[in-house]
């Protein structure tokens, strides 16, 4: 009998073991869809980004005009740009849901998978930040100025570091050129890191909502979950196409329709919505270095999740107290996102400070304590 190429060919065999014959727990829910959704987001972003890069000019005098030209004169250029800009929002929605799932179901106990995932998040945030600068509108320019300036808070080397990043004494042509180069490069780095992330995941296999081993009862990924994933793709592309076709500028800042002008500062400098929670934490501390450290800690705190797990149960499925805290954390992040979009004045300052404090308190103190308390209640 002729050998099955799917199982014998060295390259096809790898694809088969990752996407077709992969043994998968039979009880994983829709929350396990987000990994593949992130994959399709990345593919969409790379494709639309490549098409945009063909018409873009990374020069301060031409960048804004080249984006306008793409939208006006290139066949379906407006659609490609709208898909790329709103695709970033979908990407972040998916990654935040994916991380939330990981925290709720204790997936962070797969330490290597979790840590590579956080590195992926940081790379994605860097990519989105440098990408936002490229249209060279007012918010692009001032966002780049404000965020890169934060590095000057680093003692001793800060100022040198910022001028080195800028390629001069302010955000100018060299900055735009290097940001374009980075924005082109980083998605391919993300693709490479994704493969590492998956390699680590397939070492242990997927977690499941019960948090117990499922080695005794697994089903092949295809056709069961491949079909379920395609449903997920359709449900994700629906809001993406709706945004891109009906309200393409809903999530953008109107300031970015004005070409960058170093002499005019916008009244409210703020990043895209998916960074607002971190921006609110940054602003809640009245000291520059303190703010930068809090900003870094707001994401890097995820590295501590495996160390802060004190419960004898892996998931929160049967832990109502931890569940309440988890949803409190989600609400807290929504409040931070809202506060980040508001001007720096009363009452937003105090709301932001309280929300920032409760964010760190919940993750560092309340969740581990509740885990230990639940062990006691259940006589573990």
Curated annotation (Swiss-Prot):
Cofactor binding mode and count: Binds 2 heme b groups non-covalently.
Where does the record say this protein resides?
Mitochondrion inner membrane
Record-level Gene Ontology MF annotations:
metal ion binding; ubiquinol-cytochrome-c reductase activity
Its transmembrane ranges are: 34-54, 78-99, 114-134, 179-199, 227-247, 289-309, 321-341, 348-368
**What InterPro entries does the database record attribute to this sequence?**
Cyt_b/b6_C, Cyt_b/b6_C_sf, Cyt_b/b6_N, Cytb/b6-like_sf, Cytochrome_b, Cytochrome_b_C_euk/bac, Cytochrome_b_N_euk/bac, Di-haem_cyt_TM
Keyword field: Electron transport, Heme, Iron, Membrane, Metal-binding, Mitochondrion, Mitochondrion inner membrane, Respiratory chain, Transmembrane, Transmembrane helix, Transport, Ubiquinone
What this chain does, per the record? Component of the ubiquinol-cytochrome c reductase complex (complex III or cytochrome b-c1 complex) that is part of the mitochondrial respiratory chain. The b-c1 complex mediates electron transfer from ubiquinol to cytochrome c. Contributes to the generation of a proton gradient across the mitochondrial membrane that is then used for ATP synthesis.
Q: What is this protein called?
A: Cytochrome b
Q: Which organism is it from?
A: Falco peregrinus (Peregrine falcon)
List the lineage, top down: Eukaryota, Metazoa, Chordata, Craniata, Vertebrata
This protein's gene is called MT-CYB
């Amino acid at each position: 009998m002729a050998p099955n190429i799917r199982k014998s060919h060295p390259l096809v065999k790898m694809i088969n073991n990752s996407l077709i014959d992969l043994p998968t727990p039979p009880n994983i829910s829709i929350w396990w869809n987000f990994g593949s959704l992130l994959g399709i987001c990345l593919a969409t972003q790379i494709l639309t980004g490549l098409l945009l890069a063909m018409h873009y000019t990374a020069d301060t005098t031409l960048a804004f005009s080249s984006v306008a030209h793409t939208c006006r004169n290139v066949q379906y250029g407006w659609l490609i740009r709208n898909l790329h800009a709103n695709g970033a929002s979908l990407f972040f929605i998916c990654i935040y849901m994916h991380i939330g799932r990981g925290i709720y179901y204790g997936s962070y106990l797969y330490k290597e998978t979790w840590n590579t995932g956080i590195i992926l998040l940081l790379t994605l945030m860097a990519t989105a930040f440098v990408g936002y600068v490229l249209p060279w509108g007012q918010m692009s320019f001032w966002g780049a100025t404000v965020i890169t300036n934060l590095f000057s808070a680093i003692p001793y080397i800060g100022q040198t570091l910022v001028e080195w990043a800028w390629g001069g004494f302010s955000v100018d042509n060299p900055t735009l050129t290097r940001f374009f180069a980075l924005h082109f490069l980083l998605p391919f780095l993300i693709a490479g890191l994704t493969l590492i992330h998956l390699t680590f995941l397939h070492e242990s296999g997927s977690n499941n909502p019960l948090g117990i081993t499922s080695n005794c009862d697994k089903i092949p990924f295809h056709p069961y979950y491949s079909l379920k994933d395609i449903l997920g793709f359709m449900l994700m592309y629906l809001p993406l196409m709706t945004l891109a076709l009906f309200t393409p500028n809903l999530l953008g800042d109107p300031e970015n329709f004005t070409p960058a002008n170093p002499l005019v500062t916008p009244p409210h400098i703020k990043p895209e919505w998916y960074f607002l929670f971190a921006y609110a934490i940054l602003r809640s501390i009245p000291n520059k270095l303190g703010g930068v450290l809090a900003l870094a800690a707001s994401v890097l705190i995820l590295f501590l999740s495996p160390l802060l797990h004190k419960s004898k149960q892996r998931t929160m499925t049967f832990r109502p107290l931890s569940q309440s805290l988890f949803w409190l954390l989600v609400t807290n992040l929504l409040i931070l996102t809202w506060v980040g979009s508001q001007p720096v004045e009363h009452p937003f300052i105090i709301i932001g400070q309280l929300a920032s404090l409760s964010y760190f308190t919940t993750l560092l103190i309340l969740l581990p304590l509740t885990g230990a308390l639940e062990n006691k209640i259940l006589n573990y």
